[in-house]
């Protein structure tokens, strides 16, 4: 098996179904739920037939449309046979440059051991969705390599038919253009997606950080008899102005959209979020809901929207979903009240990574046994820490850390940090390979600098991309408090006051930034 949780390479990929779905003790309750979830007229368990569901559904509880941890999930048909996951690789990632100079956004390293793409793929696998496509276009080489190494062999699922496959943008006689947007990317591969005998398509982004049970999301879609279900994040007034907001009716049906509203337009988008399951006190703090860019779309609806109703639409969020609402389709909101971060900018990426070091509870935890995050098994040795002072930090596999100080930082794979170095509030991405002793000796003879952090260097509030060579006595502390600077020829950029050293860059000894 070519995939593993970083902390436990031997773990089974597809976690077993929840005991409630397979044990005799819970069979009666699950049969009841299956009848509710089954499509109209479809035979349920034990020969029973589900009653036709009216277009205006009866809500058994507001929790039916929220990500409640206490709710029970019994999908029929099972997600492994009835849902196709489609992960969008994203655009050129210009706001994340220079991290996207040589890689696609979803391939950007995350949390010492992982890459961004591991998040949606792991969420799918943990939700029993094992048929997954990843659509890519820009700088796809490292993303393709990671996916093939991490998820290339059989990954289980129904009759061991699971897969994670990369679909690259391509030109054809019928369509000479590259992907023009999220909807266009899906449209160009509809011929392939249509071949799968599934009920729904699950549309996901490849650059979000969150942990979500998609089975509950899909169950809500079926229970409400929706054509489209949109994952929604509760928002307070301060954050709401930066997002696309949605307004819902008393049944949780989306009736209006507004992109980054302000003033009176913002107030007009207030909703009663208790409809979606929030407690009264929290609902008062969070009176807005924002789209997460995550959708469950019934198969026949997707084909109709992209081929017939909106054949020229390029984007789901700004064109297809509002268009479907305007034509009278049932577009439901599904509340996700957990940590979620769109890794769209250098600042957001930096904060998301350092957030995993937060005490006592990190913003996002990679240590959840019930829903692990999988990645490529690299078979690296344990990290070696020699006479170092390390506090409030996360250290990846295979690092060599000598007599230095590391505080509130994330240290990536194969990082080498020399004596006397000080690393504070920093993300080190590490290296793709080790240099041999012979390599280092040859470099020293030529006056070169090995991969890693040199002696007595001081790095604060920075991102050091992979394979960077930082010499001795280097200061990366933004001494002039510069907020924006593009010094690519010198090996670094500054965005939002954060210094980002480019992949494979070389900073000579004594450099001061």
From Swiss-Prot:
Pathway as given in its UniProt record: Glycan biosynthesis; starch biosynthesis
Listed GO biological process terms: glycogen biosynthetic process; starch biosynthetic process
Entry comment describing in which tissues the protein is expressed: Leaves and starchy endosperm.
EC numbers on record: 2.7.7.27
Subcellular location as annotated: Plastid, Chloroplast; Plastid, Amyloplast
Reactions catalysed: alpha-D-glucose 1-phosphate + ATP + H(+) = ADP-alpha-D-glucose + diphosphate
Keywords assigned by UniProt, alphabetized: Allosteric enzyme, Amyloplast, ATP-binding, Chloroplast, Nucleotide-binding, Nucleotidyltransferase, Plastid, Starch biosynthesis, Transferase, Transit peptide
Transit peptide location: 1-64
Activity: how regulated: Activated by 3'phosphoglycerate, inhibited by orthophosphate. Allosteric regulation.
An example Gene Ontology CC term for this record: chloroplast
InterPro entries linked to this entry: ADP-Glc_PPase, ADP_Glu_pyroP_CS, NTP_transferase_dom, Nucleotide-diphossugar_trans, Trimer_LpxA-like_sf
One term of GO molecular function: glucose-1-phosphate adenylyltransferase activity
A Pfam family the protein falls into: NTP_transferase
Main function: This protein plays a role in synthesis of starch. It catalyzes the synthesis of the activated glycosyl donor, ADP-glucose from Glc-1-P and ATP.
Self-association state and partner proteins as the record states: Heterotetramer.
Family that this chain belongs to: Belongs to the bacterial/plant glucose-1-phosphate adenylyltransferase family.
Protein name: Glucose-1-phosphate adenylyltransferase small subunit, chloroplastic/amyloplastic
Organism: Hordeum vulgare
